[in-house]
């Protein structure tokens, strides 16, 4: 089947694949055609992000489908966006969560659940005040300082 891949800004390309191909394979083909490294690509189908380890058939992607391509800046990690992407430990958590969700949900439902969890996590981080961050930093940097007067932080 032929898929059309359209970057948000730029020229679209067509790739020949089977429905059993993994998303990562599609990214490799797009990389060859558009000279965009796979780790900078985020493919979307009907507004939903596609996970590299899933097959096109998992998302019911058929012939003549159109995928949107978002190109990430060179330094940004793949997998999650925003603040979570800058921390490799958090990236590992999302990968582990993805594996667990895949065991209990359909690929589409697992993607929805994970997407909502990531949004909730990032919203929680954005809502932290500077005082919250300072308290957290003191507790992390001085875990054994129970005798230390930190009342000024509360």
Swiss-Prot record:
Keywords recorded for this protein, A-Z: Cytoplasm, Nucleus, Transport
Is the keyword Hydrolase in the record? no
The residues covered by the Ubiquitin-like domain are 1-76
Among the Pfam families in the record, one is Tugs
What Gene3D superfamilies does the entry give? Phosphatidylinositol 3-kinase Catalytic Subunit, Chain A, domain 1
What does the protein in this record do?
As part of a cytosolic protein quality control complex, the bag6/bat3 complex, maintains misfolded and hydrophobic patches-containing proteins in a soluble state and participates in their proper delivery to the endoplasmic reticulum or alternatively can promote their sorting to the proteasome where they undergo degradation. The bag6/bat3 complex is involved in the post-translational delivery of tail-anchored/type II transmembrane proteins to the endoplasmic reticulum membrane.
Q: What SMART domains does the entry give?
A: UBQ
Q: Which GO terms describe its biological process?
A: post-translational protein targeting to endoplasmic reticulum membrane; tail-anchored membrane protein insertion into ER membrane
Recorded hits in InterPro entries, A to Z, give: Ubiquitin-like_dom, Ubiquitin-like_domsf, Ubiquitin_CS, Ubiquitin_dom, Ubl4_C_TUGS, UBL4A-like, Ubl_UBL4A-like
Record localization: Cytoplasm, Cytosol; Nucleus
Q: What is this protein called?
A: Ubiquitin-like protein 4A
Q: Name one GO molecular function term.
A: protein-folding chaperone binding
**Upper taxonomic classification of the species?**
Eukaryota, Metazoa, Chordata, Craniata, Vertebrata
Q: Supply the source organism for this entry.
A: Esox lucius
